[in-house]
Amino acid sequence: MDDRGNNSGEVGEFASSSMIQESIDLKLLAAESLIWTEKNVTYFGPLGKFPGKIVITRYRMVFLVGDGGKMYEQWKLDIPLGQVSRIEKVGRKTTSVAKRGDDNYGFTIYCKDYRVYRFTCNPASSDRKNVCDSLNRYAFPLSHNLPMFASVHAAETPRLMKDGWKIYSAEKEYERLGIPNSRLWKEVDINKDYKFSETYPRTFVIPTVSWEEGKPFVKKLGEFRSKERIPVLSWINQTTLASISRCSQPMTGISGKRSAEDERHLTNIMNANANCRELLILDARPAVNAKLNKAKGGGYEENYVNAPLTFLNIHNIHVVRDSLKRLLAALIPRVDEKGYYKALDESKWLNHVQSILEGAVKAVFNVDTEKQSVLIHCSDGWDRTAQLTSLAMIQLDSYYRTIEGFIVLIEKEWCSFGHKFGERIGHGDDNYSDGERSPVFVQFCDCLWQIMRQFPWAFEFTQELLICMLDELYACRYGTFLYNSEKIRLKDKKCDETTISFWSYVLENKKKFRNPMFKHGKSNKVINVNPSLCGLHVWIDYYARSNPYVVTPNHEDVQQPGAQFVDEKKQLLDEIMALDDAAQKLTA
């Protein structure tokens, strides 16, 4: 195989783009060169075994069900290679075919969203090695010294009229929050070269009093907080001045080390709100975990004046990863109807979702009702902290419930403040057992979906945006979610120049994601979420979408109970969208 992935073989073959497209009508993306095709492959799906053909490109693997030489478009299985977690070969050619049977030689694809696809090949005639080698090479480009598909794709794609990289501007967002006109808060550029904190954005906002203490004071703050992630502003109510700030854990250690600068800084945050009697600190971790972190040099705020501390009991990335695995085991490939609720309970997934929602609701109550400021952190401040600040801000500020505002929120609270997308997803890396991988962002989207269920009229977008965003999170077609920080993404890799933003696609396809029930006037208020466990649901449309026994399949020969109602609902929503578009044109 050369660098382009070209192969030759008796059964598997490298075919020209025009030949493949003519035979299967496969629409290729820019730079999506064809790598390999393999005939006489069988897919083992929830509905049975289906013979067909595999086509591998630089971006995806496509399986097409064949019937007498005819390919059915509705049975096209399309898997972006960025979603692949690992490929596992099954069976060996040295084993007797008669003993093994036709179903025991092939390979299994395990995806990062926990979907599993099993394929078998004919051991006598197939070229499984080239299939798996091609998949491994392009599913894990970083492990094979290849560029990410996002950069290859962008190099051959004309820039869209609406450039998603330009939607978020820290300066513009802070202006929206009234910071330039505030005497109490100041946007500072001490991190303009990312030398103060490599995982923080280029600019951030701190109390003016803290900045006037001088740069040595700010640097002292960085020395006392994990990864130099000092307490900074995320959001402020311009009327009450109640604010949400975020940071990482203080490095108190076993000895209980203190920092006069850090304590003064938190007092400055409290004093920036005249209504504030105390600064509530919400530590996302379970108390026992926070105490154990002291042995590693971390810790929590024990001796701060007027700064009560509450532990939210939200578990770490390892617990979350295991919990989602358990949930999906109960949903795919088949559901054990008798044991489903037991399996759901044992997964504890909804319990974890509830813990996060409860924490966000607590922050909203203190900021909106009590008019008090809050400070939120976990260990390093890039996982649970981002979940909590984002969900609280969505409830408090209707701007973040619009499509544009949601883009700004994700760019600010997740991308610019250093959520480690690269490590949590494992982009381009074949080390599937990496303990740093965890569905933290998926969990955030689940929490948001729960809120959208309670307030369907309050959001300009539907769950389709969340699902599309999660798919592209793995697919690596866009640069938005690549790498671990703003510094790496924008300064080192220059993704804003070398890749396309996912938000460009969203803005070009706004109609696809627009919520016809969105009420502009009614949606401007704070929404008060009920985090009760009995009101939470499993996000079937996302987690179980590959299970046709749960989600209605598209295959014409399978009649699923309720399928006609799903089609009617979609038709009605399309009609509502058309009427909404017509009404907007009339009022324009």
Swiss-Prot record:
Keyword Cell membrane part of the UniProt annotation: yes
Keyword Lipid metabolism: yes
Active site per the UniProt annotation: 378
Protein EC: 3.1.3.95
Domain GRAM residues, every copy: 20-91
Effect of a null allele: RNAi-mediated knockdown causes an increase in PI3P levels in intracellular vesicles. Also causes an increase in germline cell corpse engulfment, although corpses fail to be cleared. RNAi-mediated knockdown in ced-1, ced-6, ced-2, ced-10 or ced-7 mutant background partially restores cell corpses engulfment.
Binding site for phosphate: 379, 381-384
Span of the signal peptide: none
Tissue-specificity statement: Expressed in embryo, larva and in adults. Expressed in a few head and tail neurons. Expressed in hypodermis, body wall and pharyngeal muscles, sheath cells, vulva, distal tip cells and coelomocytes.
Regions annotated as coiled coil: 563-588
Reactions catalysed, as given in the entry: a 1,2-diacyl-sn-glycero-3-phospho-(1D-myo-inositol-3,5-bisphosphate) + H2O = a 1,2-diacyl-sn-glycero-3-phospho-(1D-myo-inositol-5-phosphate) + phosphate; a 1,2-diacyl-sn-glycero-3-phospho-(1D-myo-inositol-3-phosphate) + H2O = a 1,2-diacyl-sn-glycero-3-phospho-(1D-myo-inositol) + phosphate; 1,2-dioctanoyl-sn-glycero-3-phospho-(1-D-myo-inositol-3-phosphate) + H2O = 1,2-dioctanoyl-sn-glycero-3-phospho-(1D-myo-inositol) + phosphate
Recorded topology in the membrane: Peripheral membrane protein
Record-given protein name: Phosphatidylinositol-3,5-bisphosphate 3-phosphatase mtm-1
Organism: Caenorhabditis elegans
